[in-house]
């Protein structure tokens, strides 16, 4: 694994599309207590104090791009922002010379992410204003963006579910990048499950990987009348069948582990044991490391292990900082040593 990652030499860049959000993370220690306080304030209003919160850059595409560049990859991020949020984007990536920003003028999204404990697991609920991410189509991509697509080593389109024109955008981006690997991460498709099933049939022949989490996978399994995820054996069976039905390789990440299948073969790799401190954006870090694994020609089990390691380091960070390749490899080496 080490040699393959060290020998990774990208001629072009990894192109990431297309969403940028300004995120506010609100950490809720006592959900029931907060709900009670809100009800008490509904008649006359007032303040509820002592709720920890902070602002970060967000959006699946922006998070994936940030994680990729931390892993040492050249990245071209195509997104939308206004003059104020453009400064935030530029500041975020200012220390990384391998990043090219293609910022289309428009309204960025805004998300308030509520993080709380649910039976020992940290979960998040995101309240979003989509901004101009909602209607980001091929017409947004000018000659400069099309040139970078043509030279790309890989292209990933994220947050399909929030973009009404995502299928159209994906088709255009993949057609303009014939020699690149193509990835799609749909995000939460709960409000558009049937439409996404149709999109997969349209885009499938150009897709190298569909990247989904447990919730998204269960929704998609339901569209094909397949069993939802349960234990490891069931997960492997369901993901393999889903890959067969869609004719697309599936890369799934869950809290217990990650799974890949191309419809013929299947692999499952358990997650690293970790106490989560930060969950918003963890799937984006997993996507980034998984993509790097593809480009480095890692075997499926190696690739899943590498992606799991990257995600575990991220969620174990209070600030949610994506790891470097060396940090991920060090974790994997340490874990293997401890199991001997």
Residue spans of the language-model regions?
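Gly/Ala-rich phosphate-binding loop of Rossmann-like dinucleotide-binding domains
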Residues: 65, 69, 295
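Short arginine-rich
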Residues: 311-321
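Active-site cofactor/substrate anionic-group-binding motifs, chiefly glycine-
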Residues: 43, 49-53
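Short, conserved phosphate/pyrophosphate- and ester-handling motifs at nucleotide-, phospho-/glycolipid
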Residues: 68, 213, 283
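Conserved glycosyltransferase catalytic-site signature
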Residues: 61-62, 284
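Short, small-residue alpha-helix embedded
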Residues: 218-222, 276-300, 304-310
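Ribokinase/PfkB-type carbohydrate-kinase core domain
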Residues: 1-38, 52-60, 74-76, 81-266, ...
């Amino acid at each position: 694994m080490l040699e393959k990652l060290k020998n990774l030499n990208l001629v072009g860049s990894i192109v990431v599309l297309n969403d940028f959000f300004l995120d506010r993370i609100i950490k809720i220690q006592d959900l029931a207590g907060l709900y009670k306080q809100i009800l008490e304030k509904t008649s006359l209003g007032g303040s509820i104090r002592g709720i920890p919160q902070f602002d970060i850059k967000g959006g699946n595409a922006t998070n994936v791009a940030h994680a990729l560049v931390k892993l040492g990859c050249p990245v071209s991020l195509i997104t939308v922002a206004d003059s104020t949020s453009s400064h935030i984007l530029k500041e975020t990536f200012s220390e990384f010379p391998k990043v090219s920003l293609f910022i289309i003028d428009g309204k960025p999204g805004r998300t308030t992410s509520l993080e709380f404990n649910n039976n020992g697991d940290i979960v998040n609920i995101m309240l979003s204003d989509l901004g101009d991410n909602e209607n980001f189509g091929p017409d947004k991509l000018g000659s400069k963006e099309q040139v970078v697509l043509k030279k790309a080593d890989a292209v990933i389109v994220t947050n399909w579910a929030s973009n009404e024109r995502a299928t159209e955008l994906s088709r255009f981006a993949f057609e303009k990048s014939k020699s690149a690997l193509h990835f799609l991460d749909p995000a939460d498709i709960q409000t558009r499950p049937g439409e996404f099933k149709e999109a997969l049939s349209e885009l499938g022949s150009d897709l190298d990987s569909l990247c989904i989490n447990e919730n998204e996978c269960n929704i998609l399994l339901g569209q094909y009348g397949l069993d939802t995820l349960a234990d490891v054996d069931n997960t492997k069976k369901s993901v393999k069948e889903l890959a067969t039905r869609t004719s697309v390789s599936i890369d799934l990440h869950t809290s217990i582990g990650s799974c890949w299948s191309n419809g013929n073969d299947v692999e499952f790799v358990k997650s690293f044991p970790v106490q989560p401190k930060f969950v918003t954006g963890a799937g984006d870090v997993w996507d980034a490391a998984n993509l790097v694994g593809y480009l480095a020609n890692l075997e499926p089990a190696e690739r899943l292990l590498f992606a799991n390691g990257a995600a575990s380091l991220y969620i174990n960070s209070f600030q949610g900082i994506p790891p470097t390749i060396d940090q991920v490899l060090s974790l994997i080496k340490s874990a293997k040593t401890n199991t001997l």
